[in-house]
């Protein structure tokens, strides 16, 4: 019988995700924290924490489904979650400060990371939402600009 109150952090190795994991580990109402990351190993600060299960995922639809199936096998009773993956820019995607900077490839990469992947998580996670409690999920997108960029007109 499922009796735990569990939480999930997707993109747990990023700055916001790591902070969410730290906060959830200190929450005594949560029994287990499942941290998902594209980084295979948990940061050293989380080693030997019996409350935490670190899970590797490449964020493809197939791997998201595999990860959720693992949560099901662990009888996850999800009451709280944070989906923190998203990109503002990376080596391949630069901020579009002019209309001419926009490319199909960069838009596809940004939309996939910030919109498609979170919805794929929700689609699969509905199977592990708590049956007895309300499950609260936050989706945090990285697609925001700095205040100084906004004063200059922002990004596209």
Give the residues covered by each predicted segment.
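N-terminal Rossmann NAD(P)H-binding glycine-rich loop of SDR-like oxidoreductase domains
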Residues: 12-26
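Conserved glycine-rich Rossmann-like NAD(P)H-binding loop of the short-chain dehydrogenase/reductase
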Residues: 25-44
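A short helix-coil junction within the Rossmann-fold of NAD(P)-dependent oxidoreductases
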Residues: 27, 75, 124-133
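Rossmann-fold cofactor-recognition segment
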Residues: 47-63
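Short-chain dehydrogenase/reductase
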Residues: 68-69, 122
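A glycine-rich helix->loop->beta "capping" turn
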Residues: 70-90
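Catalytic loop of short-chain dehydrogenase/reductase
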Residues: 87-91, 95-115, 119, 134-156
């Amino acid at each position: 019988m499922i009796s735990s109150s569990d939480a999930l952090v997707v993109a747990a190795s990023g700055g916001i995700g790591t902070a969410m994991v730290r906060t959830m580990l200190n929450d005594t109402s949560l029994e287990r924290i499942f941290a998902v990351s594209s980084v295979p190993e948990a940061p050293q600060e989380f080693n030997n924490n019996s409350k935490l299960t670190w899970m590797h995922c490449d964020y493809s639809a197939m791997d998201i489904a595999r990860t959720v199936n693992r949560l099901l096998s662990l009888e996850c009773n999800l009451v709280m979650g944070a989906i923190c993956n998203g990109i503002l820019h990376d080596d391949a995607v630069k901020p579009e400060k002019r209309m001419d900077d926009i490319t199909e490839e960069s838009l596809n990469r940004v939309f996939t990371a910030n919109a498609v992947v979170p919805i794929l998580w929700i689609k699969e996670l509905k199977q592990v939402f708590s049956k007895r409690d309300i499950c609260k999920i936050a989706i945090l997108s990285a697609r925001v600009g700095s205040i100084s960029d906004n004063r200059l007109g922002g990004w596209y």
